[in-house]
């Protein structure tokens, strides 16, 4: 029986199968696209974009109804990769006691607002993404028009938001004052700082051991996970941070939101012929996370794989389950 998924102005209908239990065999997925670092990595970035475009075409061929939202994702990624070529951010100073708190008390290494941002690059990327958003869907186009009318030719307000760091409550307050859709405004701002955030993650990567954290929140910035990934022949399970994109190890049989390990109350389902994309349900807290098992997925981008299976999120929602960190692309 087909399921029609509506995400903003995008609609797709696909057949869905069901399953119960947990997977006990898997093979390694490819890592997400790493950020380009400096001018010498320009060609690496281009190769990554070519692979992304190829995968997008594969998904569009299989699921034509996702064409418009996938085109939007591709345009955003291309703009972000272009921004990386001239990115300049400060180094992140770390105090010795921070790592002690990380290991002994379970605090994250930094907070979201601690990521240094290239303000000028973020402002320019925001303006570019507004242009891209005009062709995304009617609601996005309307919100972009309101944003441009509010900001006008003066970048002061926008620059101030970036200078204050990522403070979601402050951003939501500004969105309300400007009578904007919070989700659209947050999406545009977060997508604009993404290159800076990824550069910050690269700075701190050597300070963390992703194999030993085993907690339900990101060891780097403290944010909740947006996706679950299965890697390596033994099927190690990793969580993907909803904010910074860092990946860390977690238990295979576990709800990452309520820590439930009872197999009887943990189950999953997947789309017909799409066993590599699963919805892991917890009957204790009635929340879910999407899991990407890249057994047959070459050079996979987890966010893209998530975006191409929004129909599964709709089915989970219909059954009364919530996703704590929903895909930001459903605007």
Question: Can you say where each PLM-predicted feature lies in the sequence?
Answer:
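Cys/His-clustered metal-coordination modules, chiefly Zn-binding fingers
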Residues: 199-316
